[in-house]
Amino acid sequence: MTKTKIMGILNVTPDSFSDGGKFNNVESAINRVKAMIDEGADIIDVGGVSTRPGHEMVSLEEEMNRVLPVVEAIVGFDVKISVDTFRSEVAEACLKLGVDMINDQWAGLYDHRMFQIVAKYDAEIILMHNGNGNRDEPVVEEMLTSLLAQAHQAKIAGIPSNKIWLDPGIGFAKTRNEEAEVMARLDELVATEYPVLLATSRKRFTKEMMGYDTTPVERDEVTAATTAYGIMKGVRAVRVHNVELNAKLAKGIDFLKENENARHNLS
């Protein structure tokens, strides 16, 4: 049975929109990682720069100081480690420590050395769709063009196709209607040769789904609904805060999909 990968979010920042300040010391980060592994995480995604609206850019030195001690403490755990960074210097420092994956929210567009660094260490990379919100074509067409172009550049740099993931970038450089369009047409991204990761957890899109004001934590059940929808559309991984809820849901949806496929094959 094909298992949907669960990526647990570990923000080692003081100002992330959902859990800023909770895990920005090594001891609390270690405890959170152990808990997420017990809850069913396949991948831990460590981030040292907040992406919340209005966040301040931190220096390279500050990002290194936030991320490296935590990565060093958890890299030996029995779980795949990803680092959420768009800086090749941070990526290389973490890859030297033994991380498996780089999650680049700018898909190599911010730092053109990113692909060669990831290729050098034979690691995986996630390419997330981003931008300034201005586009000359419909959002899904622009997303596909941009991501496939960057994936091609990653392959030229030496990263094999099976180590390149695509993320549609829900919550980044898109209007509410554009996010809804991307979600409705996820299968078009899934139809490419690359595995897709969906990252909606506790974001504005899930707040809009609720139809009334909520705190980030109150959006977990609706996040799980997007997990179920994404799996049915064919995504291969989800990036979430609430690992336990989404891992259980994904296991159930995976079973039902496998059951349906098996019965179709018998008919």
Swiss-Prot record:
Pathway: Cofactor biosynthesis; tetrahydrofolate biosynthesis; 7,8-dihydrofolate from 2-amino-4-hydroxy-6-hydroxymethyl-7,8-dihydropteridine diphosphate and 4-aminobenzoate: step 1/2. GO terms for molecular function: dihydropteroate synthase activity; metal ion binding. It catalyses: (7,8-dihydropterin-6-yl)methyl diphosphate + 4-aminobenzoate = 7,8-dihydropteroate + diphosphate. It is an enzyme of class 2 (transferase). Transmembrane segments: none annotated. Its EC number is 2.5.1.15. PROSITE patterns: DHPS_1, DHPS_2, PTERIN_BINDING. InterPro entries: DHP_synth-like, DHP_synth_dom, Dihydropteroate_synth-like_sf, Pterin-binding_dom. Residues 1-251 form the Pterin-binding domain. Its cofactor is Mg(2+). Pfam families: Pterin_bind. One of its GO terms (biological process) is folic acid biosynthetic process. Keywords: Folate biosynthesis, Magnesium, Metal-binding, Transferase. SUPFAM superfamilies: Dihydropteroate synthetase-like. (7,8-dihydropterin-6-yl)methyl diphosphate binds at T51, D84, N103, D167, K203, R239, V240, H241. GO terms for cellular component: cytosol. It comes from the Bacteria. Belongs to the DHPS family. NCBIfam families: DHPS. Catalyzes the condensation of para-aminobenzoate (pABA) with 6-hydroxymethyl-7,8-dihydropterin diphosphate (DHPt-PP) to form 7,8-dihydropteroate (H2Pte), the immediate precursor of folate derivatives. Homodimer. This is Dihydropteroate synthase. The lineage of its organism: Bacteria, Bacillati, Bacillota, Bacilli, Bacillales.
